[in-house]
Amino acid sequence: MATRNRTTVYRKHRDACKSARAPLSLSASDSFGGPVIEMVSGSFSRSNHSSYAPLNSYDPGPSSSDAFTIGMPPAWVDDSEEITFNIQKVRDKMNELAKAHSKALMPTFGDNKGIHREVEMLTHEITDLLRKSEKRLQMLSTRGPSEESNLRKNVQRSLATDLQNLSMELRRKQSTYLKRLQQQKEGQDEVDLEFNVNGKMSRLDEEDELGGMGFDEHQTIKLKEGQHVSAEREREIQQVLGSVNDLAQIMKDLSALVIDQGTIVDRIDYNVQNVSTSVEEGYKQLQKAERTQREGAMVKCATILLVLCLIMIVLLILKNILF
């Protein structure tokens, strides 16, 4: 059963209620005269199809007509949490699918239809979770205020990368499973062909012809079971091919977001390089300005005046000494 952790939301509401002053007295006449503490239900109320009723509390202070609002997280946060939860479920089911693949590929003498049905069911559930997460991911960029668009896009790209990695891993597992199924089918066909060459067995003979060739009832049943297993393998191969095609479409949709993320990273690198070039150019201009300031006319005039002042001081000293 799917569960969601609401401990953080509960603690937020509890702390907000504690911050309000406790009512000193409450009567029937003034029970609705105090401020209204509005518990604004955001995405949490949408997920549980319920809303909070206003809580009335009496405040004897001067701000008896004030009201404050306790905000909930935006709707897109719930979408991201649901996608994260689906990603974890996909990882768990992929582990179960790997075990089911191992059981289905083991040679058995009995009926293994239950294992094949389990593989089919797990593959269908994983594909549905990936499709559902992909739709939620596409809605993520359109929900919420425009001020949070950059944050939503970063979360969207991060989740898209995780979904694409899971899709690639599932596709790789399905391809490996399909290859081993085909190898088993080819091995069985080679055995049937060998029997045909030796004149001992024919897959296309009718039951009467088999009896005429000297096969007893037990051998005829075994032959029919082998044909049934071969048809079952063929059906599984077609099913795996279908799931691989579905995964290819999902990966195609997710690749746009991942490519967008790579484009932004390249753009950041380009901007960093431009900033580095601009800083170097600015440093050169600063050095040039410093040299210009040192070699300017004002500096030359000040130097000449200083030299003249020194000369005049020397002449004044000599005048006093000589005369």
UniProtKB/Swiss-Prot annotation:
Disulfide bonds: none annotated. InterPro entries: SNARE (IPR010989), Syntaxin (IPR045242), Syntaxin/epimorphin_CS (IPR006012), Syntaxin_N (IPR006011), T_SNARE_dom (IPR000727). GO terms for cellular component: membrane; trans-Golgi network. It comes from the Eukaryota. GO terms for biological process: chloroplast organization; defense response to fungus; Golgi organization; Golgi to plasma membrane protein transport; Golgi to vacuole transport; intracellular protein transport; protein secretion; regulation of defense response to fungus. It is a single-pass type IV membrane protein. Keywords: Golgi apparatus, Membrane, Plant defense, Protein transport, Transmembrane, Transmembrane helix, Transport. GO terms for molecular function: SNAP receptor activity. The keyword Cytoplasm does not apply. Expressed at low levels in roots, stems, flowers and leaves. The chain crosses the membrane at residues 303-323. Residues 1-302 are cytoplasmic. Disruption phenotype: Gametophytic lethal in homozygote plants. Slightly shorter roots. The double mutant syp41 syp42 have short roots. The double mutant syp42 syp43 exhibits severe pleiotropic defects, including short roots, a large number of lateral roots, semi dwarfism and early senescence; these phenotypes are associated with defective secretory and vacuolar transport pathways. Residues 227-289 form the t-SNARE coiled-coil homology domain. It is found in: Golgi apparatus, trans-Golgi network membrane. Pfam families: SNARE (PF05739). Belongs to the syntaxin family. Interacts with VTI12 and SYP61 to form a t-SNARE complex and with VPS45. Contributes to the regulation of secretory and vacuolar transport pathways in the post-Golgi network, and to the maintenance of the Golgi apparatus and trans-Golgi network (TGN) morphologies. Vesicle trafficking protein that functions in the secretory pathway and mediates liposome fusion. Required for extracellular resistance responses to a fungal pathogen. Also involved in the protection of chloroplasts from salicylic acid-dependent biotic stress. This is Syntaxin-42.
